[in-house]
């Protein structure tokens, strides 16, 4: 999935953080025309990766689960950021959720909930009726 400038992904369970926090997020609201009204901006927090700030990812499959009501959202952020070289996550000062990811976007990020899929590189998450064929040194 191609992300724009100052965009990343947030995975939530039942609309709340669940990897080291329990913040209840302001979720995007579906509009009659098929678009989404973004959620509210989070409060400002000085970011420090793994310690403080609003944590987002570029690889939601690493933060996914088949347990509970898990969803991934496109997020935009502003302000200071904190990250470690080569990691899949970033801590940001302030962000908001723009919309849920589509099934196709989830699949492009390696999250499969049904169907048959081939994976040649990277990390993926398969659940439900999905099946995945791995190639090379990959394993399922």
Q: For each predicted feature, which ranges?
A:
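Short, glycine-biased loop/turn motifs at secondary-structure junctions and
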Residues: 1-139
């Amino acid at each position: 999935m191609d992300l724009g400038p100052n965009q990343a992904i947030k995975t939530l369970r039942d609309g709340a953080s669940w990897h080291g926090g329990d913040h209840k997020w302001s979720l995007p609201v579906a509009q009659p025309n098929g678009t989404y009204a973004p959620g509210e901006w989070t409060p400002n927090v000085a970011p420090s990766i793994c310690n403080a700030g609003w944590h987002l990812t570029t690889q939601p499959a690493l933060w996914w689960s088949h347990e509970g009501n898990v969803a991934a959202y496109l997020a935009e952020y502003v302000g200071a950021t904190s990250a470690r070289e080569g990691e899949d996550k970033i801590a940001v000062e302030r962000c908001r959720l723009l919309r849920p990811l589509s099934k196709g976007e989830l699949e492009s990020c390696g999250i499969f909930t049904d169907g048959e899929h081939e994976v040649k590189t990277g990390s993926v998450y398969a659940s439900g009726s999905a099946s995945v064929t791995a190639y090379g040194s990959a394993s399922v």
